[in-house]
Amino acid sequence: MSRFTEKMFHNARTATTGMVTGEPHMPVRHTWGEVHERARCIAGGLAAAGVGLGDVVGVLAGFPVEIAPTAQALWMRGASLTMLHQPTPRTDLAVWAEDTMTVIGMIEAKAVIVSEPFLVAIPILEQKGMQVLTVADLLASDPIGPIEVGEDDLALMQLTSGSTGSPKAVQITHRNIYSNAEAMFVGAQYDVDKDVMVSWLPCFHDMGMVGFLTIPMFFGAELVKVTPMDFLRDTLLWAKLIDKYQGTMTAAPNFAYALLAKRLRRQAKPGDFDLSTLRFALSGAEPVEPADVEDLLDAGKPFGLRPSAILPAYGMAETTLAVSFSECNAGLVVDEVDADLLAALRRAVPATKGNTRRLATLGPLLQDLEARIIDEQGDVMPARGVGVIELRGESLTPGYLTMGGFIPAQDEHGWYDTGDLGYLTEEGHVVVCGRVKDVIIMAGRNIYPTDIERAAGRVDGVRPGCAVAVRLDAGHSRESFAVAVESNAFEDPAEVRRIEHQVAHEVVAEVDVRPRNVVVLGPGTIPKTPSGKLRRANSVTLVT
């Protein structure tokens, strides 16, 4: 067995901890030993279906109580798991089926495992000639034990954001998971006997699948897991579960914490729940906005939320999950730098007066990872030099599976180009400024879309997290940009004119450049990934 599966199966046999699912209406708790026994039955069914070492299996299941034993069963069979993108009630199933079959063909899936609430997809998949297995049928099989699996066998094929159309899957090995899991254990100062993890993150995203399902299953950690739909129906369920189970650890993207802050102010009163047990509230998967963190701390103070609990972090599917964690108990650490020097000279010079930019530091690198910052000539930059972040280490993916075949992620020396622009502080802490492909270059200045979007989001009437800055004329000598925002008042001409004017005003005040145009759209118009990130490249048609 690999180190990953050996430790996971050992902890399943010895741990008294487990996983609570089904909140808020039908909570049920299974110990990791019970999850393992269910996995052995599913593994028996997989063996009968011909699934074995090296096979790839797609999974379309919505409930963590079924995803956990299914994932473990696939690893017992030496197979790898791909969580397929899930259709929503508004999804055109015919279009979804075509996109999904493209992914299934690319990964050469041996079968697809389907469970509630996606059983409606079974006839569609079978019509396409796919072998479909259900969790219910697999659970009825005779249990078997694990087969021998190597360190470099694939465990996960993580679909990247926006994978439909031109899909790409990040290949994650047993070695990758083991290395990143052990590093996160140290970085989070994890205590198996005391810590309780609470999560609503989706299992089709790396933070939900790896960080808040695979990792607790691997270490035998106590986990309370609900679905994204549960969170969307009642944002405060997140806080209620932390209170009920005395949760100590959670994680989410920046937008979710901003939404929680709003709900705490509008719908809760002190005494409704206690958040003082929370010691590790990781913010990742999208840029961490210091103002949003500070707003959450202000809204959460009456409920016992401690400033030291907030933990900005940096990660990506290509490193299995995590790259750096802020130091435990340090809280938000802001690096305030001269915005003009940052834009013009690509230097992050500390400043407290004049035109400054506040950036969240994302902590030191986790163990077994190295980072360097590279300039446009390929030279390594010193501390506070802004360039492309490159990474190297044992948790780093060997590469991607694409429609054209395998593409290695690492150069001949093992370095991976993240596509992120950022710098390292004198202490070696990571700071991310933006994505190379999204940066707008005007008159030799680097203008970051996140700055524009933050300014647009300050305008009254703009929906939170629903402003996107789009680069125009990319590749020409003179670039420009446009801004699209969503508003509930998109059909009111007077309100639209006001919002357009105020967005332009706020953007000029923030970055000293006027957008070519501002477009006000209805709710749900701006394209986002399944995990809620803005799809800037896909937004061009909205503003042109």
From Swiss-Prot:
Pfam families: AMP-binding. GO terms for biological process: fatty acid biosynthetic process. There is a cross-link at K528 (Isoglutamyl lysine isopeptide (Lys-Gln) (interchain with Q-Cter in protein Pup)). GO terms for cellular component: peptidoglycan-based cell wall; plasma membrane. Pupylated at Lys-528 by the prokaryotic ubiquitin-like protein Pup, which probably leads to its degradation by the proteasome. PANTHER family: DISCO-INTERACTING PROTEIN 2 (PTHR22754:SF32), DISCO-INTERACTING PROTEIN 2 DIP2 -RELATED (PTHR22754). This is Putative ligase Rv1013. The lineage of its organism: Bacteria, Bacillati, Actinomycetota, Actinomycetes, Mycobacteriales.
